[in-house]
C-alpha cells in the first residue's frame, strides 16, 4: 500500500516548499525579476532587518553555485562605479560650531553611527575639509568627565587655541566646563581624539580601491562628485553599507560564489585573540578598554571564557544622561539586561541578538547575520561537534596561516549548518536570562557570575547543553570579509589591522610628546554629576 504521506517530486505541496531559515540565512537574496527595476536599484537603507533578507525569497533558495544563467550574465564587482552606491539625499552633516550635545543628538535623530563635521563654524555643507563625529568621540568625552581618560593620553597638540593660554590649560578648562554642565564645541573633542584621515574617492572610481581601503580597517570613506581638489562630497560609504550591497547583489557577482559557500575556517579569516570583558566587571571598565584599545566592540564572557554577550561603543548613548549614570558602575551583564529590555520596548518584542557563529559556518551565513543584525563583527565559538577538551587554537583552525593558501585549498561547497535551530534560540534566551538576573537589585554581580558559572559547569561542556553560545575562540569582522574580497581579486595582501594600528600609533606618539610632569589632571573619584548631557 502506498504511503499516504509520501509526495512525488511533481507534488504541488513539494514544489511550493518554502525555504528554511537556514537556507534564507545562507544564500544571497535573489536578483530582481525583469518586471521590476534593474539590478542597480537595490535599497541601501540603514534600517536593515531580518525581513529584508527574506523579501522575495519564496522560490527555491537551495545552497550551491549560482545558476548558469546568472553566471553568464554576471558582472565583475570590481568594475562597479561608486556612483551606484552613493545616496546624496541621505548625506547628513554638521559644522564645527555644533556642541558635543548637538552632535550626539544628530546621530540619534538620524539613526547614524557617524556624521561628517565641516571645519567651518557656520556652513555644514562645506565638506571640502572635514572630520567625523561618532560614538567613540562620545565615549572619550564621557571618560574625560569621569577621570577615566587623561588629557596627556590624547592629542592635545591638535587643539586650536587663541591667546596666550597653553593647549593643555585650555583643554583642562574645557573639561572643567563640561563637568559643570557647560557646552563644549564638538571641534574640541574631535581634535583630542583623532581618527584615520578621511579617504576620498570620486564617484566614477571603481569599487576595488574603496574595497581595499575598507578591507584595511578604515571604517568609512567619502565619495566626491569628481576627482578635482575642491569636489564636494556626495555620499559616505561605510563598511556596513558596502557589505550589505555586496550581499544583496551577490548573485550578480559569480566570482563571490566560491567564497560565500566556503566556511570561515577554510577561508582562514578572522582573529583567534578577540578582546573581551568579563560580565561581572563594571560597565565603565568596558568603555575604558574600548577607548584604550581603539576598538568599537568587546565580547562579554564569563570566567570560563564562555560567550555571554556583546557590548558596542554605540551603547555609550544609553549612559549619557544622569538617570542612567549608575549603570556605569554596575556589571556589564546588568547593562546588557537593561539594553535588551529597552530595545524590546522600542521594538515591541523580546530582543535576543544573534551575535555568534562557529568556525564551520559558511561565509554566506556570516554575512547574512551581519547584515540582518547590522553588526560589525560576530564572535566565533567552539563548534558543537568539538569536545570540551579541544584547545582554542584547534577549535578555530589554522587561523594564523596564510589566507591565500587556505583559499586555494578550501572546499567549494561549504556545509549548511543549522545555527538557528531551536537549541540555538534557547542559547540566546538563556544568555538574555543570565543578563536579566544581573538586573535584579537584590542580586550582586558576584552572584550573577556564580550563577552563570554554575550553569556552565552543570553541563560539563562549553557549548553543549549549557544554554550559552559556547566557549569563545575568535572573532570575524566586516574588515576581515571586505579584505578577503579585495585580496581574492588581485592577490594583493590586505592587512585588516592596518588602520587600527595607525590609530594606536597616533595616540602613542601624542602621549610621548606631552610633558607628563604636570601631575594628575582629574580627581580619582567622581561622586555626583549631572550626566554627560544632563537629565534627559
Swiss-Prot record:
Location relative to the cell: Cytoplasm; Nucleus
Stretches the record annotates as Disordered: 1-72, 439-466, 496-536
Taxonomy, superkingdom: Eukaryota
GO biological process, one term: cellular response to glucose starvation
Domain (CBS): residue spans on this chain: 192-255, 267-327
Composition bias type Polar residues, residue spans: 1-17, 42-55
Biased composition, class Low complexity, residue ranges: 439-460
Keywords, comma-separated and alphabetical: CBS domain, Cytoplasm, Nucleus, Repeat
SUPFAM superfamilies, alphabetized: CBS-domain pair
Recorded GO CC terms: cytoplasm; nucleus
GO molecular function, one term: protein serine/threonine phosphatase inhibitor activity
Keyword Repeat: yes
Pfam families linked to this entry: CBS
PROSITE patterns, per the entry: CBS (PS51371)
Family statement: Belongs to the SDS23 family.
Free-text function comment from the UniProt entry: Involved in DNA replication and cell separation.
UniProt protein name: Protein SDS23
Amino acid at each position: 500500500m502506498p504511503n499516504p504521506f509520501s509526495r512525488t517530486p511533481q507534488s504541488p505541496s513539494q514544489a511550493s516548499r518554502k525555504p528554511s531559515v537556514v537556507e534564507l540565512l545562507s544564500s544571497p537574496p535573489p536578483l530582481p525579476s525583469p518586471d521590476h527595476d534593474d539590478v542597480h536599484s537595490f535599497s541601501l537603507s540603514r534600517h536593515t532587518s531580518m525581513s529584508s533578507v527574506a523579501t522575495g525569497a519564496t522560490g527555491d533558495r537551495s545552497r550551491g553555485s549560482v545558476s548558469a544563467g546568472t553566471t553568464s550574465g554576471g558582472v565583475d564587482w570590481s568594475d562597479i562605479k561608486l556612483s551606484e552606491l552613493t545616496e546624496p539625499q541621505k548625506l547628513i552633516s554638521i559644522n564645527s560650531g555644533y556642541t558635543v550635545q548637538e552632535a550626539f543628538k544628530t546621530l540619534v535623530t538620524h539613526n547614524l553611527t557617524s556624521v561628517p563635521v565641516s571645519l567651518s563654524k557656520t556652513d555644514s555643507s562645506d565638506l571640502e575639509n572635514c572630520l567625523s563625529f561618532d560614538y567613540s568621540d562620545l565615549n572619550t568625552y564621557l571618560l574625560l568627565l569621569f577621570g577615566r581618560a587623561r588629557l596627556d593620553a590624547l592629542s592635545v597638540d591638535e587643539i586650536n587655541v587663541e591667546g596666550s593660554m597653553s593647549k593643555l590649560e585650555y583643554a583642562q578648562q574645557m573639561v572643567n566646563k563640561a563637568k559643570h554642565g557647560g557646552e563644549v564645541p564638538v571641534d574640541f573633542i574631535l581634535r583630542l581624539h583623532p581618527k584615520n584621515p578621511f579617504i576620498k574617492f570620486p564617484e566614477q572610481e571603481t569599487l576595488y580601491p574603496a574595497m581595499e581601503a575598507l578591507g584595511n580597517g578604515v571604517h568609512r570613506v567619502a565619495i566626491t562628485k569628481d576627482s578635482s581638489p575642491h569636489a564636494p562630497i556626495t555620499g559616505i560609504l561605510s563598511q556596513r553599507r558596502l557589505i550589505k550591497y555586496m550581499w544583496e547583489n551577490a548573485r550578480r557577482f559569480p566570482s563571490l560564489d566560491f567564497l560565500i559557500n566556503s566556511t570561515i575556517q577554510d577561508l582562514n579569516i578572522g582573529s583567534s585573540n578577540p578582546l573581551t570583558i568579563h560580565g561581572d566587571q563594571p560597565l565603565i571598565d568596558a568603555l575604558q578598554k574600548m577607548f584604550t584599545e581603539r576598538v568599537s566592540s568587546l565580547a562579554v564572557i564569563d570566567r570560563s571564557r564562555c560567550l555571554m554577550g556583546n557590548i558596542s561603543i554605540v551603547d555609550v548613548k544609553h549612559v549619557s544622561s544622569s538617570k542612567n549614570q549608575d549603570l556605569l558602575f554596575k556589571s556589564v551583564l546588568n547593562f546588557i539586561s537593561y539594553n535588551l529590555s529597552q530595545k524590546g520596548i522600542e521594538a515591541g518584542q523580546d530582543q535576543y541578538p544573534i551575535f555568534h557563529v562557529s568556525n564551520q559556518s559558511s561565509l554566506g551565513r556570516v554575512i547574512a547575520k551581519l547584515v540582518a543584525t547590522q553588526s560589525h563583527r560576530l564572535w566565533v565559538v567552539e563548534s558543537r561537534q568539538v569536545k570540551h577538551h579541544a584547545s582554542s587554537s584547534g577549535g578555530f583552525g589554522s587561523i594564523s596561516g596564510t589566507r591565500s593558501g587556505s583559499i586555494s585549498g578550501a572546499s567549494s561547497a561549504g556545509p549548511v549548518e543549522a545555527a538557528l535551530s531551536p537549541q540555538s534560540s534557547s542559547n540566546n534566551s538563556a544568555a538574555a536570562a543570565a543578563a536579566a538576573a544581573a538586573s535584579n537589585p537584590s542580586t550582586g554581580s558576584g552572584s550573577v557570575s556564580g550563577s552563570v558559572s554554575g550553569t556552565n559547569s552543570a553541563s560539563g561542556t562549553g557549548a553543549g547543553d549549557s544554554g550559552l553560545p559556547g566557549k569563545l575562540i575568535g572573532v570575524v569582522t566586516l574588515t576581515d570579509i571586505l579584505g578577503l574580497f579585495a585580496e581574492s581579486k588581485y592577490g594583493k595582501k590586505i592587512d585588516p589591522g592596518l588602520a587600527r594600528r595607525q590609530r594606536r600609533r597616533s595616540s602613542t606618539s601624542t602621549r610621548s610628546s606631552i610633558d607628563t610632569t604636570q601631575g594628575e589632571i582629574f580627581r580619582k573619584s567622581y561622586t555626583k554629576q549631572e550626566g554627560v548631557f544632563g537629565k534627559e
